């Protein structure tokens, strides 16, 4: 069982690595030089010889074309550039989290302002905000006051946020989702 796992892992890593130099098993390939000019169609052995003369590598760019396209480049530099592009793409991706702001419908003005400021900070950071009003005991009878509070919050944050989900009751909570404005 262990041998099969090792074989499967090596097959996967071979598929991820691009075909370079002797790994290219096509009899004839179209060769592109380092400056982008085409050298024409030739055998893969001739192309490898030309790449070796220039102290570079022959890298398979597209095996779907007929004949397959290979490029003469410095493989180490090529791989570094690809990894650099991947790192830059990962840096630019921002996963927006959902941050929660909890309060009660009988909230004091200062506490309400603190909640508004916190929600505004989350929204400016690009995160979504889940505003939750919790009820205890018989407070659930005053759900209209909680809805008014959440609508007031949406109104106060309309400069930086848009309502993604209007206030709705879920069990002993009333929730509303806000998303940052684009």
UniProtKB/Swiss-Prot annotation:
One of its GO terms (biological process) is ribosome disassembly. GO terms for molecular function: ribosome binding; translation initiation factor activity. Its main location: cytoplasm. Pfam families: IF3_C, IF3_N. The keyword Protein biosynthesis applies. It is found in: Cytoplasm. The keyword rRNA-binding does not apply. GO terms for cellular component: cytosol; membrane. InterPro entries: T_IF-3_C_sf, T_IF-3_N_sf, Translation_initiation_fac3_CS, Translation_initiation_fac_3, Translation_initiation_fac_3_C, Translation_initiation_fac_3_N. Keywords: Cytoplasm, Initiation factor, Protein biosynthesis. Monomer. PANTHER family: TRANSLATION INITIATION FACTOR IF-3 (PTHR10938), TRANSLATION INITIATION FACTOR IF-3, MITOCHONDRIAL (PTHR10938:SF0). Belongs to the IF-3 family. IF-3 binds to the 30S ribosomal subunit and shifts the equilibrium between 70S ribosomes and their 50S and 30S subunits in favor of the free subunits, thus enhancing the availability of 30S subunits on which protein synthesis initiation begins. This is Translation initiation factor IF-3. It comes from Thermosynechococcus vestitus (strain NIES-2133 / IAM M-273 / BP-1). The gene is infC.
């Amino acid at each position: 069982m262990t041998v099969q796992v090792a074989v499967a892992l090596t097959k996967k890593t071979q598929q991820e690595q691009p075909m370079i130099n002797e790994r290219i098993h096509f009899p004839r390939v179209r060769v592109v030089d380092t400056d982008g000019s085409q050298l024409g169609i030739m055998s893969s052995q001739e192309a490898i010889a030309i790449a070796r003369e220039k102290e570079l590598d022959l890298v398979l760019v597209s095996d779907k074309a007929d004949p397959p396209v290979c490029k003469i480049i410095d493989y180490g530099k090529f791989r570094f550039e690809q990894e650099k592009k991947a790192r830059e793409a990962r840096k630019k991706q921002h996963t927006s989290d959902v941050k929660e702001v909890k309060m009660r419908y009988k909230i004091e003005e200062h506490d309400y302002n603190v909640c508004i400021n916190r929600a505004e900070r989350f929204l400016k950071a690009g995160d979504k905000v889940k505003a939750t009003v919790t009820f205890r005991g018989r407070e659930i009878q005053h759900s209209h006051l909680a809805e008014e509070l959440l609508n007031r919050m949406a109104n106060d944050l309309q400069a930086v946020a848009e309502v993604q989900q209007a206030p709705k009751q879920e069990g002993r909570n009333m929730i509303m989702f806000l998303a940052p404005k684009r």
